Design a protein with these regions (language model features):
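Hydrophobic/aromatic side-chain positions at a characteristic register within alpha-helices
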Residues: 16, 32-36, 124
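Residue-level detector of alpha-helical secondary structure
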Residues: 13, 48-51, 167-173, 177, ...
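Inter-repeat boundary and helix-capping residues of tandem alpha-helical solenoids
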Residues: 11, 17-20, 89, 103, ...
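Helix-turn-helix repeat elements of alpha-solenoid scaffolds
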Residues: 1-8, 33-48, 81-93, 115-119, ...
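Canonical positions in the second alpha-helix
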Residues: 50, 98-99, 122, 176
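Eukaryotic intrinsically disordered, low-complexity segments enriched for acidic and Ser/Thr/Pro residues
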Residues: 1-14, 199-203
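Long alpha-helical HEAT/HEAT-like repeat alpha-solenoid scaffolds in very large eukaryotic proteins
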Residues: 150-184
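Amphipathic alpha-helical repeat scaffolds of TPR domains
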Residues: 18-33, 45-48, 52-81, 102-117, ...
């Protein structure tokens, strides 16, 4: 059963086990288990009860859950299953925005909000935040990849300005600690930089 999405459903089981071990978010654990069993309607009924209860919790409890959840799902392809839209909209996003107000000098909520402005703010507050650094590099390079994806016929944007953006990604790359991540990102950056330079030489 579910063989074609086995990794996704294994993620649900692992996350349920982790939530149950903590002991505070048992309904979220039950949601994951019912979803893993393919019982979507029952799972979302449980999730809605959990959301209703969590919305009434103090900020500290909501922050603890959101921090645990986002740390748990980081890098997982099953993120959309572990954080369905109702949970994202009603708990995760409001809590993150409140967090930036309650703790203005904390990098973590900015890291998880994850747009370019907030990722840059996260690194201002904590230059050692590896997740924020990696996310920002990837976001910058996806923008560049969009600009170059019609080459050699057309460039979407300003290649000269985008070379400066690539140089920012190269600067950020120096702070990546994981050598595997660093090598992979370096290859991505080098390929895009070469594509822009070749386009400019051919003009």
């Amino acid at each position: 059963m579910h063989y074609w999405r086995k990794d996704f459903f294994e993620s649900l089981k692992r996350t349920a086990s982790s939530a149950r071990a903590i002991g505070t978010w048992l309904e979220y654990a039950d949601f994951c288990l019912e979803y893993e069993r393919g019982l979507r309607r029952q799972a979302f009924a449980i999730l809605h009860r959990f959301i209703s209860d969590m919305e009434r919790k103090p900020f500290e409890e909501r922050r603890r859950f959101v921090s645990w959840l986002l740390t748990t799902v980081e890098g997982q392809e099953a993120r959309h299953m572990l954080i369905p839209n109702p949970l994202q909209i009603q708990i995760v996003e409001p809590t993150l925005m409140e967090w930036t107000q309650v703790e203005p000098h904390c990098a973590e909520p900015h890291r998880w909000i994850g747009d370019r402005e907030h990722l840059e703010r996260a690194l201002e507050l904590d230059p050692d935040d590896q997740i924020a650094r990696r996310k920002l590099i990837i976001q910058i390079m996806r923008y560049i990849d969009y600009a170059t994806h019609h080459l050699p016929s057309v460039y979407l944007g300003s290649p000269v300005e985008d070379l400066a953006v690539v140089e920012k990604a190269e600067f950020l790359l120096k702070g990546i600690a994981n050598e595997t991540d660093k090598a992979s990102l370096a290859t991505f950056i080098a390929e895009e930089k070469t594509a822009i330079q070749e386009y400019l030489r051919g003009k």
